[in-house]
Amino acid sequence: MLQENLIKIYETSFRDNREMPALTDYFKGETFSYYEMAKEVAKLHLLFKKAGIRQGDKIALIGRNNPRWCITYIATTTYGAVIVPILQDFTPADIIHIINHSESRMLFLGDNFWDNIEEEQIRQIEAVFSLTDFHTIYERDGKALTKFQRDILKNYRSKYPRGFSINDIKYPEIPNDQVILLNYTSGTTGYSKGVMLTVNNLTGNVIFAQRMINTQTGTFYFRKGGRTLSFLPLAHAYGCAFDFLSPLAVGGHITLLGKIPSPKILLEAMGVVRPTVICCVPMILEKVYRKQVMPMLEKGPMSIAVKIPLLNTAIYSVIRKKLLEAFGNNVDIFIVGGAPMNQETEAFLMKIKFPITIGYGMTECAPLISFTPDNEFKAGSCGRYLHEQLEVKIDSPDPQHEAGEIIVRGEHVMKGYYKNEKDTEKVLEPDGWLHTGDMATMDPDGTLYIRGRSKTMILSGSGQNIYPEEIEDKLNNMYLVLESLILETENGKLKALVVPDYEQAELEGVDKNDLPQIMQNNLTELNTLLAAYERVSELAIYPTEFEKTPKRSIKRYLYSPSLLTK
């Protein structure tokens, strides 16, 4: 158990950084200082007390990233209740299921989400509040809480007759082993599980983030006055930990985008906010590489210049400068996570010395398992496991050369799945070892190299392990391929389901009728890059992008080899 405590970390941060900006709504322009945020937290604590909320009670939260989403999260956890953040991409049926399964007593939501919920579908919810201004949307019995919120300023002044001072920023003692977060997974297996995370789990992640440093320059990634642009869903463990909880612990300024991050919106916001840390999924950088960098390198004078040893360094320097300018020209580090990164994109970014590192984690570890500063990052890896917080082993007779399942134990590992002993026992051993389901090799220094998911691994007829993700990575680099899936048929053959990049094809004037032949040419080229046992026998075009989870992982379970014949 760690000595530090997350609740006390925020108590200190709100006091020490009281005049600093904490949260900004990018489109509304509304900003809360740390002091103003602490006052809003205090008002919600009064509401919780009036409602009879006790430590351990559940409070559900759903909505776009905005300041009051963050305030609700912090108010709940510093009170000792359990926050249940729900991904806004979930279907109404899933949202209702999570509210009921978690036994939440209160619900805070964006106003538009209430249109999809009937009161009788969530009978244990006592009251619903708006994330627009915290007004009461619905109260099951009577109007006591509605009246209390209507008179919140009077109630607040009654509690703090001399005004709210920094000495009033004092939260109850909440032990590190207490559950304060119930995080429902994205359901890539088709079933959402409630991950029980403790004060200790979150503390471990935040403490590690506070110590993240470029060991060459001495620059701390998360620091007082640092800026982040939050565009990943905060209900997801990755975005929550590093776009929200970590900067808030050190006096960082979090700007919340609050809209779907289209390239146009995102790059405009980057120019305004000029973030010092950017947390993103690989797709963001992969799109920039494909749409902006590759065309320059493949056509025109630059395609010739990069092949000349003395010129290519200068060309790479120009590209690096332009990319950094596109992201606000102030960034110290791109922390990439949530999914594997395309190897070609990664290799290019490292070649131009782009400030990038790739981490690895999972919701069940709140989420971080491995991370390396960008100046120490090894190509193809996802960083070193966190030696101070975790033990990691590879279930393989030769972990350095033969992939095996990553197994983890330590400060970040969850208590289990809520009301689900059966699934908990499947992944969590009695002595605390968590089975991640991810296959990897590991260097002697603890650097991990992910190969794929154990559930997606295919065993060839000759006994060789085939990782579909590795083949997909190669195929996705080929001409006019947007994304792909490698599937195994009943007779053991590998077949590819490919989504063409229709937008790029149109820009280049490629006839749609030519796409099947282009994809067949890609298949021929792909097989020259693969071992004999990995070769793909057939390819079919899929007409639309694959359905994905909120963290942009393809929902593989929705797709079967039968689609290849349609």
Feature map (PLM): residue ranges:
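Conserved AMP-binding/adenylate-forming core of the ANL superfamily
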Residues: A22-G52, D57-N66, C70, I74, ...
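Conserved AMP-binding A3 loop
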Residues: S33-Y35, I180-I207
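Conserved pre-ATP/AMP-binding loop-to-beta segment of ANL
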Residues: E19, K154-Y184, Y191, T217-R227
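Conserved AMP-binding/adenylation subdomain of ANL enzymes
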Residues: T203-R227, L234-K321, N330
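Structural core segment of the AMP-binding/adenylate-forming
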Residues: A51, T78-R157, Y502
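Conserved ATP-binding/catalytic segment of the ANL
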Residues: K393, Q400-S460
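Conserved C-terminal "lid"/linker of ANL adenylate-forming enzymes
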Residues: I458, E483-I486, G492, L523-K566
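Gly/Ser/Thr-rich phosphate-binding loop
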Residues: T276-C279, Y289-F377
